[in-house]
Amino acid sequence: MPSVLWWGRFDPGYSRNRILRKQFADLGWQVRAFQPRFAGLGDWEASLRRLPRPDLIWVPCFRQRDLLAASRWAKRHRVPLIFDPLISAYDKQVDECGKLNVGSTRALRLLARERALFRHANRVMADTPAHADYFVRVLGVERTKIEVIYVGAEEALFRPGPLPPETPEVPREVLFYGSFIPLQGPQVVVEAARLYQGPPLKWVLLGEGPLRRMCEELAQGHGTISFEDWLPYEKLPERIQRADILLGVFGATPKAGRVIPNKVFQSLASGRVVVTRLAESYPDALLAAENHGLEWVPAGDARALAERVATLASDPIRLRQLGEAAAATSRQYFSEAAVRRQLEKALSGLATDGLVGYC
């Protein structure tokens, strides 16, 4: 049985890690974990602990700090290494948060450091084709070293379910959930709720984050807008099922156009129509199709969002049909089986290059 070592100070409960670790196991791999006390000295700790040599090292999402030490140990033991960054530190600091100006000394230094870092991996995983293009264009990763594996959703938790019963006393519900960051554009949701003109509707924003206070201030005086605190991950599927329409992301930042957030995968798998910004991150075939359970609106356009939600809320039959289409889209493009095929392809690529001999 081949073994993969999940290397880094990662969160085992994060959905990307949970899903991929399960897919490795389903493919017949033994999955082990090594979480060093200090990321930069991980190779020293691994040597002192005499870690058994795995067939593959996987440095998971957000663990840029672990990559260098992991690569040193991997090269010493002749083990291939896959890096699954999910984000770019340069992208986050410059394009997303605007903390560093493009072309500034600090930005250029960060870019050079990250470009050098990515070269230590035998393969780099991207969660969308748009992110793969970014890694090639900006970070200088060789196209042949990149594979795309969508995040998907855990099917044991997120399953299609019927819409809530329609009653005159209880309005339909549109649900946004997330971490209230600029990429998600929660303020666009609040503004859309303020502009909304349509059948009675309850707008719910669930979660915590830097923009929540601002959103609460914008929502003052509007009784149809409410906020809920974050809830345990295991209770999220049931919360989704209580809503009729799910909202994705609406930020106008460059990064917002390169991602498919967890909640879009989870909402589609739950059989709910998702209204979200148009982005190049989705499969081309899906973008070209109709009736896929995704309703596109321009980034940052609150009025377009309000109008699209009003159209959906006015047609219960169409709402149900779109929910069924959403579940079908999840099965076709983002199911665990689809993710597993993408992972298998990435591992086969390593074997083709002679880096491993077990795929």
Task: List each model region and its residues.
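Nucleotide-sugar-dependent
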Residues: 91, 184, 232-239, 246-268, ...
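Conserved donor-binding/catalytic core segment of Leloir-type glycosyltransferases
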Residues: 5, 166-194, 204
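Carbohydrate-associated surface elements
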Residues: 130, 152
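Nucleotide-activated donor-binding/catalytic signature segment of Leloir-type glycosyltransferases, i.e.
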Residues: 171, 213-239, 296
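Active-site proximal beta-strand in glycosyltransferases
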Residues: 74-93
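Conserved acidic donor-binding segment of nucleotide-sugar-dependent glycosyltransferases
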Residues: 288-303, 311-316
